[in-house]
Amino acid sequence: MATIFDILNTLNNNNFENCKRQCSTNKSNKTIIDILPPMDVTITNDKLIIETELAGISKDQIEIDIKDSILTIQGERKDLNKQHNNNNNNNNNNNNLVIEKSTSTSSTFR
C-alpha cells in the first residue's frame, strides 16, 4: 500500500509532467488539455480520501477507475464562448460567432 509520501510525490511529479504536456493532440486532431486540479488527500486507519473540485463538470461526466493499483479520475466539460463581431460600418449587421471548446481533465495516481 502506498504511503502518504508516495501519494504526495506522485502528485508533485504529475504537476510537472502535466506542465510539460499541458496541450497535446489526440488521434482525431482535437486538442486535449490535461489539468491537475488542487486536491485534498486524507488518510485514516481504513480509508484514503481524495477531495477535489472539478468546476463545470457534473457528476455524470466524471469517470473514476482503479486498475492495477492506479486511480484515474477523468472528466470532460464543454465551454461555449460567444464572441460578437460588430461591424462598425453597419450597426444593424451583427455577426454572432459561437466557438465550442472541449476541455478534458484526467488525473492518475499509483
Curated annotation (Swiss-Prot):
Record-annotated sHSP domain positions: 30-110
Keywords: Stress response
CDD domains attached to this UniProt entry: ACD_sHsps-like
Keyword Protease attached: no
Ranges of biased composition (kind: Low complexity): 85-96
Gene3D superfamilies in alphabetical order: 2.60.40.790
Compositionally biased tracts (Polar residues): 101-110
InterPro entries assigned: A-crystallin/Hsp20_dom, HSP20-like_chaperone, HspG1-11-like
UniProt region (Disordered), positions on chain: 78-110
Family: Belongs to the small heat shock protein (HSP20) family.
PANTHER family: HEAT SHOCK PROTEIN DDB_G0288861-RELATED
Record's protein name: Small heat shock protein hspG11
Species for this entry: Dictyostelium discoideum (Social amoeba)
